[in-house]
C-alpha cells in the first residue's frame, strides 16, 4: 500500500488562515501535513497584497521557503523567492507583504501570540 502524498503548491485550494482562532484578513492556507492539535507539520501559506501576520513568538524552530513574492519582516529584512528562512525558538516578530506571496512552511510546534 502506497502512503505517498503529492501536493502541487500552485494547484491547491486555500482556506482562511485561522491558526490563532479567527481568520487573519488576507491570509489563507492549505494544510499538507499540519496538525492543529500538535502545531507540527507542513502547510502552504498565501498572503494577499497588504496582509500582515500577528505578532508572535516561536516556541520551537520554524522554517519556510519563499515560493513566490516577497515578505517583509519586523526589522525590514525582505525575504524573496527562493529564500529559505529559519526562525529559532524564542524569536518574536510579525511579517507583512506589499504585493502578496506564497510560502511553504515547516512547523515544529505552535507559535504563541503576543499581545502588543
Over which residues does each language-model region extend?
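Glycine- and acidic-residue-biased ligand/ion/polar-headgroup-sensing regions
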Residues: 49, 58-74
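Conserved short histidine dyad/triad with adjacent acidic residue
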Residues: 28-58, 88-92
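A short, N-terminal "cap"/entry segment at the start of jelly-roll beta-barrel domains
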Residues: 1-38
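Short glycine/proline-enriched turns and hinge-like loops at secondary-structure junctions
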Residues: 57-59, 77-78, 97-99
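Structural motif
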Residues: 40-42, 64, 101-102
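Short acidic-glycine-tyrosine-enriched beta hairpin
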Residues: 73-93
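Ligand-binding loop in jelly-roll beta-barrel domains
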Residues: 89-114
Amino acid at each position: 500500500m502506497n502512503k505517498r502524498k503529492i501536493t502541487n503548491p500552485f494547484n491547491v485550494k486555500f482556506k482562511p488562515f485561522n491558526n490563532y482562532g479567527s481568520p487573519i484578513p488576507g491570509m489563507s492556507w492549505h494544510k499538507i501535513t499540519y496538525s492543529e492539535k500538535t502545531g507540527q507539520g507542513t502547510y502552504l501559506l498565501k498572503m494577499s497584497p497588504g496582509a500582515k501576520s500577528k505578532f508572535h513568538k516561536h516556541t520551537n524552530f520554524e522554517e519556510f521557503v519563499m515560493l513566490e513574492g516577497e515578505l517583509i519582516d519586523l526589522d525590514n529584512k525582505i525575504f524573496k523567492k527562493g529564500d529559505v528562512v529559519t526562525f529559532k525558538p524564542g524569536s518574536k516578530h510579525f511579517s507583512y507583504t506589499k504585493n502578496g506571496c506564497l510560502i511553504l512552511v515547516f512547523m515544529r510546534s505552535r507559535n504563541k501570540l503576543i499581545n502588543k
